[in-house]
Amino acid sequence: FKNRSVRNLGFGWDKTENVLWRIYHGELDGFKANMIFLLIGTNNLQFNTDKEILQGILQVTEAIKIRQPQAKLCVMGILPRANTEKRIQQINKELRKKLEQNCIYINLSNLLTDKNGIINSSLFSDGLHPNTKGYEKIAEVLKTYLDN
């Protein structure tokens, strides 16, 4: 994202509750963002129900909108991961429905899976994290939102 002022506020192992805590404690204070991209939820999969994950993501989006009301909020669906593709597809389907009125929903699953919805292992380093090629594909999509 050359020639752009970008802040990466993501942390490894974060769950929705960690992001909420940081937002409530000033993470989004002191600057005005034009656009915010949110990708959260995958680390909640082993600890929370689908409903709890959905509620957590929605709480994060509301907290962002309160603190950065001028920003265009783009929420990416949970990225597919090995052996949980169907569950993630269902959560993302519900997430898209809930967000389509207030946010831009970005579906990256089709980019990273085959026609059957199974992850394309050539785009992942470990079945969870995209590799360089996977991140390049994601970046191409995100650039289209930045350019519009």
Locate the predicted segments by residue.
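Conserved SGNH/GDSL esterase-like catalytic core that processes O-acyl groups on lipids
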Residues: 1-62, 66-68, 80-93
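A non-catalytic structural micro-motif
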Residues: 68-74
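Catalytic His-Asp segment of secreted/periplasmic serine-dependent ester chemistry enzymes
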Residues: 82-148
